[in-house]
Amino acid sequence: MKSTVEQLSPTRVRINVEVPFEELKPDFDKAYKALAQQIRLPGFRPGKAPAKLLEARVGRGAVLEQVVNDALPSRYSEAVTSASVKAIGQPEIEITKIEDGELLEFTAEVDVRPEITLPDYSELSVTVDPIEITDEAVEEQLLSLRQRFGTLTGVERAVEDGDFISIDLSATVDGEAVPEATASGLSHEVGSGQLIEGLDEAVVGVKAGESKEFTSTLVAGDHAGKEAVVTVTVGTVKERELPAEDDEFAQLASEFDTLDELKADLRERVARVRKVEQAGQIRDKVLETLLETVEVPLPEAVVKAEVDAALHDAVHGLDHDEEALNKLLEEQGTSREEFDKDAKESAERSVKTQLLLDAIADASDVTVGQDELTERILFQAQRYGMAPEQFIQQIQQAGQLGAVFADVRRGKALAGVVEQATVTDTSGAAVDTAELFGNGEAETEEAASTDEAASDSTESEDQK
């Protein structure tokens, strides 16, 4: 087999492949074997009919078609490997010549990873906010802890912000009841915004046993995107009573004997959180600087695939009705044109980030150990409230294990850049990135390189 590569653009190539027919003998044998199992010829046991008789039955053209279709994927992969083509996504294959018994020729156009010129990381510099631990932040943590140990007590008054209520909900659209928007005995914290839009404002001032109507836009179901009249009936009203802020509470809620000891521990926790936040800010600013200074040609097909994925996600909860999406966007004060523009910009940034960090990882020979991959998987399983075995099975079935690997590798690549960059806070003090990121590796999920909200398009395309 012979192959040559033409560079069509920085992100696309055409591979020209010539395959002599003698190299297709295994493919012909496979095709005849499959036909022998499918076709019964008098005088021959199943699977034993001669190739010439099988060919006479189905025609030479049908055999050639089967052989070529079976041979193309493996010959394409062989050409990609032999030419060290860094292909992304599915190729567009065109058969250009078939000389029966002599030669098969085809071309394959495919997107590729572009060549990227990387900067001197030591010349990068960013400025971030300093770590500040205020008394107010400690008091917020203490209040949160007291709320966890609070008790709910029924009250004989109208609903106020922060109360806990039980409610019944029903809704109509154009006078017709909406069954999927009907519920009874729901528990809700007023002001949390966890249920339907407009509910928190509607229930304030309502007493137990009373009802109130308000309007809200439905976001799912057959009436998604439509304005509904919602009726809420308040069943019970409870307020949360907080324990006193004293030594007794410290002993109840922690391992400490005094409130001062508990506050000291909370201050240390706030400090750890602030360090993680600063690490995230450093990561984001270094990445932003890289994206601004490094030119990365973008493969159009990969960007389009990510835009299409964003649209698919947006209409998934709307029964894939794009008109419903357009109406919903209009009600939200935006438009489909703005949505498409934002989706394209987001896709371009996501693809550029992935390609850039992959190039940095390649140049730095970044590797990922099994323990690092396992640590990330365990973290994500915990994050989604799943057993590790269940999470692993799910990502394997979805073909996303490679994406997790790539995400860890990109995180390590970016951490290596951060280690070489100059980082100061707004007061002018140098920031010790080694303390936050370790020896060139991100040690926390927050210090990882890529936003998991964005799909890992280049990795998923590589696997196709």
Swiss-Prot record:
InterPro entries, A to Z: PPIase_dom_sf, PPIase_FKBP_dom, Trig_fac, Trigger_fac_C, Trigger_fac_C_sf, Trigger_fac_ribosome-bd_bac, Trigger_fac_ribosome-bd_sf, Trigger_fact/SurA_dom_sf
Highest rank taxon of the organism: Bacteria
Cellular compartments annotated: Cytoplasm
Coiled-coil residue windows: none
Annotated ranges, domain PPIase FKBP-type: 162-243
GO cellular component labels: cytoplasm
Keyword check for Cytoplasm: yes
Keywords noted in UniProt: Cell cycle, Cell division, Chaperone, Cytoplasm, Isomerase, Rotamase
Enzyme class, spelled out: isomerase
Function text: Involved in protein export. Acts as a chaperone by maintaining the newly synthesized protein in an open conformation. Functions as a peptidyl-prolyl cis-trans isomerase.
Protein name: Trigger factor
Source organism per UniProt: Rhodococcus jostii (strain RHA1)
